[in-house]
Regions:
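Glycine/small-residue-rich hydrophobic helix-like segments
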Residues: 184-205
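Non-catalytic alpha-helical scaffold/packing segments enriched in small hydrophobic residues
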Residues: 142-143, 163-167, 171, 178, ...
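Small-residue-rich packing faces within the transmembrane alpha-helices of Major Facilitator Superfamily
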Residues: 56-59, 112-115, 188-191
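Transmembrane helix boundary and interhelical junction motifs in multipass membrane proteins
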Residues: 23-32, 156-167
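Juxtamembrane transmembrane-helix boundary motif
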Residues: 1-19, 31-39, 44, 64-155, ...
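Short hydrophobic/aromatic, small-residue-rich stretches within specific transmembrane helices
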Residues: 51-55, 183-187
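Small-residue hotspots at the loop-to-helix junctions and early N-terminal turns
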Residues: 44-48, 180, 184
Protein backbone atom coordinates (compact mmCIF):
# COMPACT_ATOMS: atom_id res chain seq x y z
CA UNK A 1 0.00 0.00 0.00
CA UNK A 2 2.82 2.37 0.90
CA UNK A 3 4.58 1.61 -2.39
CA UNK A 4 1.39 2.39 -4.35
CA UNK A 5 0.96 5.68 -2.47
CA UNK A 6 4.57 6.61 -3.19
CA UNK A 7 4.16 5.92 -6.92
CA UNK A 8 0.88 7.89 -7.15
CA UNK A 9 2.29 10.88 -5.24
CA UNK A 10 5.44 10.91 -7.39
CA UNK A 11 3.41 10.73 -10.62
CA UNK A 12 1.12 13.62 -9.62
CA UNK A 13 4.04 15.67 -8.31
CA UNK A 14 5.97 15.11 -11.55
CA UNK A 15 3.00 16.02 -13.74
CA UNK A 16 2.29 19.19 -11.77
CA UNK A 17 5.94 20.18 -11.77
CA UNK A 18 6.25 19.66 -15.53
CA UNK A 19 3.20 21.78 -16.31
CA UNK A 20 4.28 24.51 -13.90
CA UNK A 21 7.83 24.68 -15.25
CA UNK A 22 6.90 24.65 -18.94
CA UNK A 23 3.92 26.98 -18.75
CA UNK A 24 4.86 29.49 -16.06
CA UNK A 25 8.58 29.08 -15.41
CA UNK A 26 7.79 27.86 -11.91
CA UNK A 27 10.34 25.80 -10.02
CA UNK A 28 9.39 22.13 -9.85
CA UNK A 29 10.20 22.34 -6.14
CA UNK A 30 7.09 24.49 -5.62
CA UNK A 31 4.97 21.41 -6.40
CA UNK A 32 7.20 18.48 -5.50
CA UNK A 33 8.43 19.65 -2.08
CA UNK A 34 5.03 20.14 -0.37
CA UNK A 35 3.67 16.87 -1.82
CA UNK A 36 6.65 14.84 -0.61
CA UNK A 37 6.47 16.43 2.84
CA UNK A 38 2.66 16.18 3.20
CA UNK A 39 1.93 12.73 1.77
CA UNK A 40 5.21 10.81 2.12
CA UNK A 41 6.42 12.55 5.32
CA UNK A 42 9.89 13.21 3.93
CA UNK A 43 12.03 15.75 5.81
CA UNK A 44 11.64 19.24 4.22
CA UNK A 45 15.39 19.66 3.69
CA UNK A 46 15.64 16.30 1.87
CA UNK A 47 12.44 17.00 -0.09
CA UNK A 48 13.87 20.28 -1.39
CA UNK A 49 17.02 18.48 -2.54
CA UNK A 50 14.97 15.84 -4.41
CA UNK A 51 12.78 18.54 -5.97
CA UNK A 52 15.77 20.56 -7.14
CA UNK A 53 17.28 17.43 -8.70
CA UNK A 54 14.01 16.89 -10.60
CA UNK A 55 14.09 20.54 -11.64
CA UNK A 56 17.31 20.15 -13.65
CA UNK A 57 15.92 18.16 -16.59
CA UNK A 58 12.50 19.85 -16.55
CA UNK A 59 14.06 23.31 -16.74
CA UNK A 60 16.57 22.27 -19.42
CA UNK A 61 13.83 20.97 -21.73
CA UNK A 62 11.71 24.09 -21.18
CA UNK A 63 14.69 26.40 -21.80
CA UNK A 64 15.47 24.61 -25.08
CA UNK A 65 11.87 25.05 -26.24
CA UNK A 66 11.75 28.75 -25.33
CA UNK A 67 15.17 29.28 -26.93
CA UNK A 68 14.00 27.80 -30.23
CA UNK A 69 11.16 30.33 -30.23
CA UNK A 70 13.58 33.20 -29.46
CA UNK A 71 12.10 33.85 -26.04
CA UNK A 72 15.40 33.61 -24.17
CA UNK A 73 17.88 36.35 -23.16
CA UNK A 74 21.11 34.33 -22.93
CA UNK A 75 23.52 37.28 -22.48
CA UNK A 76 21.93 38.72 -19.34
CA UNK A 77 20.83 35.25 -18.32
CA UNK A 78 24.46 34.12 -18.08
CA UNK A 79 25.42 37.13 -15.93
CA UNK A 80 22.51 36.48 -13.62
CA UNK A 81 23.23 32.74 -13.59
CA UNK A 82 26.82 33.15 -12.35
CA UNK A 83 25.64 35.29 -9.42
CA UNK A 84 22.76 32.92 -8.74
CA UNK A 85 25.06 29.88 -8.62
CA UNK A 86 27.34 31.46 -6.02
CA UNK A 87 24.49 32.44 -3.72
CA UNK A 88 22.64 29.13 -4.19
CA UNK A 89 25.39 27.39 -2.21
CA UNK A 90 25.14 30.04 0.52
CA UNK A 91 21.36 29.58 0.66
CA UNK A 92 21.69 25.79 0.95
CA UNK A 93 24.14 26.16 3.84
CA UNK A 94 21.86 28.59 5.69
CA UNK A 95 18.76 26.41 5.14
CA UNK A 96 20.47 23.48 6.88
CA UNK A 97 20.67 25.65 10.01
CA UNK A 98 17.08 26.98 9.90
CA UNK A 99 14.03 25.19 11.42
CA UNK A 100 11.75 23.41 8.92
CA UNK A 101 8.74 25.55 9.91
CA UNK A 102 10.56 28.74 8.93
CA UNK A 103 11.43 27.29 5.52
CA UNK A 104 7.80 26.35 4.88
CA UNK A 105 6.44 29.75 5.92
CA UNK A 106 8.95 31.56 3.69
CA UNK A 107 7.90 29.46 0.69
CA UNK A 108 4.23 30.29 1.25
CA UNK A 109 5.04 34.01 1.58
CA UNK A 110 6.97 34.08 -1.73
CA UNK A 111 4.12 32.32 -3.55
CA UNK A 112 1.59 34.79 -2.10
CA UNK A 113 3.67 37.83 -3.14
CA UNK A 114 4.02 36.55 -6.70
CA UNK A 115 0.28 35.95 -7.02
CA UNK A 116 -0.57 39.42 -5.69
CA UNK A 117 1.95 41.04 -8.05
CA UNK A 118 0.47 39.49 -11.19
CA UNK A 119 -3.09 40.34 -10.10
CA UNK A 120 -2.36 43.97 -9.17
CA UNK A 121 0.17 44.68 -11.96
CA UNK A 122 -0.11 42.29 -14.93
CA UNK A 123 2.94 42.13 -17.22
CA UNK A 124 2.27 44.31 -20.29
CA UNK A 125 5.90 44.81 -21.38
CA UNK A 126 6.77 44.13 -25.04
CA UNK A 127 10.12 43.10 -26.54
CA UNK A 128 10.46 46.63 -27.96
CA UNK A 129 10.16 48.06 -24.43
CA UNK A 130 12.88 45.67 -23.24
CA UNK A 131 15.36 46.94 -25.85
CA UNK A 132 15.06 50.51 -24.50
CA UNK A 133 16.64 49.56 -21.15
CA UNK A 134 20.38 50.59 -21.09
CA UNK A 135 22.87 47.70 -21.22
CA UNK A 136 24.71 48.83 -18.06
CA UNK A 137 21.44 49.01 -16.12
CA UNK A 138 20.56 45.47 -17.20
CA UNK A 139 23.94 44.14 -16.06
CA UNK A 140 23.71 45.78 -12.61
CA UNK A 141 20.15 44.57 -12.12
CA UNK A 142 21.15 41.07 -13.28
CA UNK A 143 23.84 40.86 -10.60
CA UNK A 144 21.62 42.17 -7.78
CA UNK A 145 18.63 40.03 -8.77
CA UNK A 146 20.90 37.01 -9.22
CA UNK A 147 22.19 37.31 -5.66
CA UNK A 148 18.64 37.48 -4.27
CA UNK A 149 17.33 34.60 -6.37
CA UNK A 150 20.36 32.39 -5.75
CA UNK A 151 20.06 32.68 -1.99
CA UNK A 152 16.33 31.93 -2.08
CA UNK A 153 16.77 29.00 -4.49
CA UNK A 154 19.32 27.39 -2.20
CA UNK A 155 17.32 28.24 0.92
CA UNK A 156 13.89 26.84 0.02
CA UNK A 157 14.14 25.66 -3.60
CA UNK A 158 10.53 26.60 -4.31
CA UNK A 159 11.32 30.31 -4.29
CA UNK A 160 13.88 30.13 -7.07
CA UNK A 161 11.66 30.07 -10.13
CA UNK A 162 8.88 32.18 -8.69
CA UNK A 163 11.15 34.90 -7.36
CA UNK A 164 13.14 34.93 -10.60
CA UNK A 165 9.97 35.49 -12.61
CA UNK A 166 8.89 38.23 -10.20
CA UNK A 167 12.23 40.06 -10.47
CA UNK A 168 12.62 39.60 -14.23
CA UNK A 169 9.19 41.12 -14.93
CA UNK A 170 8.92 43.59 -12.04
CA UNK A 171 12.49 44.86 -11.63
CA UNK A 172 14.24 44.15 -14.94
CA UNK A 173 11.27 44.95 -17.20
CA UNK A 174 11.19 41.69 -19.17
CA UNK A 175 8.37 40.70 -21.52
CA UNK A 176 6.55 37.71 -19.95
CA UNK A 177 7.54 34.94 -22.41
CA UNK A 178 11.19 36.06 -22.40
CA UNK A 179 11.08 36.21 -18.60
CA UNK A 180 9.80 32.62 -18.41
CA UNK A 181 12.38 31.40 -20.95
CA UNK A 182 15.27 33.14 -19.20
CA UNK A 183 14.00 31.93 -15.83
CA UNK A 184 13.96 28.24 -16.78
CA UNK A 185 17.38 28.61 -18.46
CA UNK A 186 18.90 29.90 -15.22
CA UNK A 187 16.98 27.35 -13.15
CA UNK A 188 18.63 24.48 -15.01
CA UNK A 189 21.94 25.43 -13.41
CA UNK A 190 20.66 26.71 -10.05
CA UNK A 191 18.70 23.51 -9.53
CA UNK A 192 21.78 21.42 -10.30
CA UNK A 193 23.97 23.42 -7.91
CA UNK A 194 21.24 23.53 -5.27
CA UNK A 195 20.58 19.78 -5.31
CA UNK A 196 24.28 18.86 -5.22
CA UNK A 197 24.99 21.25 -2.33
CA UNK A 198 21.87 20.06 -0.45
CA UNK A 199 22.97 16.43 -0.59
CA UNK A 200 26.63 17.31 0.06
CA UNK A 201 25.64 19.16 3.25
CA UNK A 202 22.73 17.01 4.43
CA UNK A 203 23.54 13.62 2.87
CA UNK A 204 21.76 11.68 0.11
CA UNK A 205 18.16 10.53 0.81
Amino acid sequence: MQLLLTIVVCLFAGAGAGLGTGFAGMSAAAVITPMLVTFLHIEPYTAVGIALASDVLASAVSAYTYGRNRNLDIRNGLIMMITVLAFTVVGSLVSSLVPSVAMGNFSVLMTLLLGIKFIVRPVMTTKEDMQQIPKRTRIIKSIVCGAIVGFICGFIGAGGGMMMLLLLTGVMGYELKTAVGTSVFIMTFTALTGSVSHFAIGGAP
